[in-house]
Amino acid sequence: MRILVVFGSHRLGGTNAEIEKVMKAKSDKFDFDFVHLADHKIESCTSCHQCGKTGRCTLPISDNDRFQEIFDKMKTADAIFIISPVYAAIPSRLTALFERLTSVLYDSGVMNTDINPLLDKKAAIFSYCSCGICDDTPMKIIFDKFVMKNYRFDKSTYSYLNASKKPQDEYPNITAYVMSTLKQLC
């Protein structure tokens, strides 16, 4: 099973490195593709709506922008894990990724059909901060709004692998939470 793991942090190392190391120890069961947004430039959407004609983001931006590369990986993955710290809000590169996904999926009409390539993907979203695991419900709601066929901010309706109501009470740290969720795919 191919799992795309998107780390939303602006920093390399730290908690992300710990999680990646533990996940790699399970590489005999899973084919992981790790994307660290700290290594990738994601430009903000300009609402040019050209993706509505092509189904791909055609934003005339620098060659360093990696949105389409990440989107293509999302489409081919069997499962998507988004792991991100919460500083004061969602990190800006992760927000830009969500924003661009919205435009490509919505403007191309994919959201109004049954061909959304991300619609029934297995997904898990994890939030953490310096004091431990954070409530990931707000980020799940944002992901629903931006990516899935929902467009509601009041509640999450996408079926996540990590549906725990209070993960901070169930797990000692974010790594244990991620690995517990990963076991569901075995």
Language-model features, listed with the residues they occupy:
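Short, solvent-exposed coil/turn elements at secondary-structure transition points
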Residues: 38-40, 129, 159-164
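N-terminal beta1-alpha1-beta2 submodule of the flavodoxin-like/Rossmannoid cofactor-binding fold
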Residues: 1-84, 88-106, 110-111, 166-186
